[in-house]
A protein has these predicted regions:
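Ferredoxin-type iron-sulfur electron-transfer modules and their immediate structural context
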Residues: 1-2
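Acidic, serine/proline-rich low-complexity intrinsically disordered regions
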Residues: 6-221
Length: 221
C-alpha cells in the first residue's frame, strides 16, 4: 500500500505539471535492491542520482560506496570531506593543491564547516528512490524535487501556504548534496522547519539539465 492516496498524488502532479517523481531519502540497515557506486572514490554522487530521477532506479550509498568524499561527508559517513578541505575550497596550497576559490580564505572555510556539521548516518545505507515507489512501513526523512522554474514557483507557493509563513524557503550557500540532504535533515529538528532551495553548486550543475533546480524538505513538511 502506498504512503498516500494515488488519486491525490495524480492530482498533485497534474496541477503542478510535475514531469518526474520527487526522490525520497532515508537510511536503513537492510541492503536495498538497486545500484551503488564502485568502492571508494568514483565520481560525484549527484550524477548517480540521475538513475533514480530518469529511470526510477533505487540508488544507495554506504561508508565504502559513496562516489565522492564530499558526498560521504554530507550523508554522515565521514567526519571530514578530505584533509585540508579549508584550503581546497579557498586558495589552495602552492605546489600541493589547487584551490577551488569558492570561499575567500581558509579561515572562512573553517567557519563554513563549523556551522554545518552533518548528522552522523544513523544506519548502514543512505537510500534515494522515487517517492511513488515507497510503500507503507517505510517513510522518507527528506523529499527532494528536481524541477524547472515554473514548477518550482508552484512548489514554492504551496510550501508557504502549507507552513503558513512567508519565510518557509531559503537558499544556503552549500554543495548540491548538502542542500538536498544535510540541511533538510537539520530543518527536520526545528520547531519551524524550512524547505531548502538548491542546486546552485557550480561543480554539480554540469550533471543536470540547465533549467533544473532542487527544492528539498523534511518529509513532515
Amino acid at each position: 500500500m502506498k504512503l498516500y492516496s494515488e488519486e491525490l498524488w495524480k492530482q498533485f502532479r497534474e496541477t503542478l505539471g510535475l514531469k518526474e517523481s520527487p526522490l525520497g531519502i532515508y537510511y536503513t540497515n537492510d541492503k536495498p535492491e538497486g545500484i551503488t557506486p564502485a568502492e571508494g572514490i568514483s565520481g560525484c554522487m549527484m550524477g548517480l542520482l540521475q538513475n533514480a530521477r530518469k529511470k526510477g532506479t533505487t540508488v544507495y550509498f554506504d561508508k565504502g560506496h559513496f562516489g565522492c568524499p564530499g558526498g560521504a561527508y554530507y550523508m554522515g559517513f565521514f567526519e571530514s570531506p578530505r584533509p585540508n578541505i579549508e584550503y581546497f575550497l579557498s586558495c589552495g596550497i602552492p605546489g600541493e593543491m589547487e584551490g577551488e576559490r569558492y570561499i575567500k580564505t581558509p579561515e572562512r572555510a573553517r567557519e563554513y564547516f563549523t556551522r554545518m556539521i552533518p548528522r552522523r548516518a544513523p544506519a548502514t545505507y543512505c537510500v534515494f528512490k522515487p517517492v511513488d515507489q515507497f510503500q507503507k512501513g517505510t517513510k522518507p526523512e527528506v523529499v527532494v524535487f528536481f524541477a524547472p522554474p515554473d514548477i518550482l514557483s508552484g512548489l514554492f507557493t504551496l510550501t508557504h501556504y502549507a507552513l503558513e509563513r512567508t519565510d518557509a524557503v531559503y537558499a544556503p550557500f552549500r554543495s548540491g548534496c548538502g542542500t538536498i540532504l544535510t540541511y533538510p535533515l537539520k530543518e527536520a529538528g526545528k520547531e519551524q522547519p524550512h524547505a531548502v532551495l538548491g542546486m546552485f553548486d557550480v561543480s554539480a550543475r554540469p550533471m543536470f539539465e540547465k533549467d533544473i533546480l532542487t527544492l528539498a524538505m523534511p518529509y513532515s513538511v
